[in-house]
């Protein structure tokens, strides 16, 4: 959801709570439980789950490897579930022409720097940059160049739903709102 008026533009960012992340976290969790149960079944010599026959699988080396894959999958799955729970990457971009201030806020991982908050003056914005990479894995990223701080990405690198036309339109609207030029590289 985005909100825009004559003097204020607020753009909310979704973060890691996306349908794809939920899907992959579930698939990875269930798959790693399957590997771990087959490894445990081969160690015990009994079928823990009747769907997965494990009498043909010897514990050493196949059962050990499957147990290792199961444990590794559980760790990766727990990492994904934690990023979803903490909603890492969500936040907002707020551009206020009336006060001349830009605020960028993002949630990170728990710790000292969980809240990433950047605030600077609009007059320090030099330009809006668009980075376009076509090919096998196309990327379109929108940056804001700040005097003395370099470039700050405004869109996530994994957002592939932007067509070139949508990216150009968003960059043009933002550059018009901020009254700065657009650069393409």
From Swiss-Prot:
Main location: plastid
Lineage top rank: taxon: Eukaryota
Membrane topology label: Multi-pass membrane protein
GO biological process: photosynthesis
Transmembrane segments: 20-40, 57-77
Locations listed in the record: Plastid, Chloroplast thylakoid membrane
GO CC annotation, single: chloroplast thylakoid membrane
Keywords from the UniProt entry: Chloroplast, Membrane, Photosynthesis, Plastid, Thylakoid, Transmembrane, Transmembrane helix
The name this protein goes by in its record: Photosystem I assembly protein Ycf4
Presence of the UniProt keyword Membrane in the record: yes
Similarity annotation: Belongs to the Ycf4 family.
Phosphoprotein among keywords: no
Reported function: Seems to be required for the assembly of the photosystem I complex.
